[in-house]
A protein has these predicted regions:
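Short acidic, glycine/proline-enriched helix-loop-strand junctions
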Residues: 91-106, 186
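Short, acidic/polar
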Residues: 61-73, 127-136
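N-terminal secretory signal peptides and thylakoid transit peptides that target proteins
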Residues: 2-17
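Active-site acidic/histidine proton-transfer and metal-coordination neighborhood
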Residues: 13-25, 40-48, 118, 122-215
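Acidic-and-aromatic substrate-binding clefts and catalytic sites of carbohydrate-active enzymes
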Residues: 60-66, 82-94, 116-119, 157-158, ...
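Catalytic domains of carbohydrate-active enzymes, especially glycoside hydrolases
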Residues: 68-84
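Hydrophobic faces of well-ordered beta-strands that scaffold small-molecule active sites
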Residues: 52-58, 81-83, 106-111, 147-149, ...
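C-terminal segment of N-terminal export signals and the immediately downstream linker at the start
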Residues: 25-63, 71-72
């Protein structure tokens, strides 16, 4: 049996992820990426110059205050901070001040929007779009990579049926969100989940195909 140390764990995890994405994606990798894996000077040691950067969700780090949480993260060498999206607009200055002078940046924003985009109720869909845009704007101010969204969890009903028409509708909605995000210097991040958590967008390939069609 293979000893499950950190290196082997990462190797097997990344191999599985690569297989999930598919051979087409692997074939599209540029020679530059391959050269980067060998190092800028063409070293034969794979991954020599690669760096694993860790990020914590706000609720993971212990501490009574944001500064205490960030102090804990710094001691561990964590360089990414993932706050929740709920009420983020009112916390922009607080977070900026807390991060000032630290080697920590805002990574992704963990949801926090209201409603859900695949609801059969137009009012609930609008609530989702409006609150997502509010969070996206705040994410842009914080220099965040993007805002995470799941189209609909299993418990969110009634929802639009799993049809091509629904997929087309979803592309339209995400195109609007994505355009808004680009205007604010950030992005919308899809989060595929397993069937026990959501009924739509369960595979990385599904998310990738949406990105392709939205362009």
């Amino acid at each position: 049996f293979m000893t499950l140390n950190r290196r082997n764990f990462l190797r097997t995890s990344l191999s599985g992820a690569a297989l999930a994405v598919g051979s087409t994606a692997l074939a599209s990798c540029s020679s530059k990426s391959a050269n980067t894996a060998k190092g800028e000077k063409g070293s034969d040691k794979p991954g020599k110059d690669l760096e694993l950067k860790l990020s914590f969700q706000e609720g993971i780090a212990p501490g009574e205050s944001l500064n205490e949480k960030l102090d804990f993260m710094e001691k561990l060498g964590v360089v990414g901070f993932e706050p929740g999206g709920g009420g983020l607009a009112s916390r922009v200055n607080e977070i900026k001040q807390a991060l000032n002078g630290r080697n920590i940046k805002v990574s992704a924003i963990c949801a926090g929007f209201k409603g859900f985009i695949l609801s059969t109720d137009p009012a609930i869909r609008k609530e989702c779009m409006d609150t997502m845009k509010e969070i996206i704007a705040a994410a842009g101010e914080l220099g965040s990579t993007g805002v995470i969204i799941v189209p609909a969890f299993n418990g969110q009903v009634p929802a639009l049926p799993h049809t091509m028409e629904t997929r087309d509708f979803l592309c339209e909605q995400f195109n609007e969100m994505g355009t808004f995000a680009a205007q604010h210097g950030t992005s919308v991040i899809f989060e595929p989940l397993n069937r026990k958590e959501c009924f739509y967008l369960r595979q990385v390939a599904d998310a990738a195909s949406l990105c392709r069609d939205i362009n």
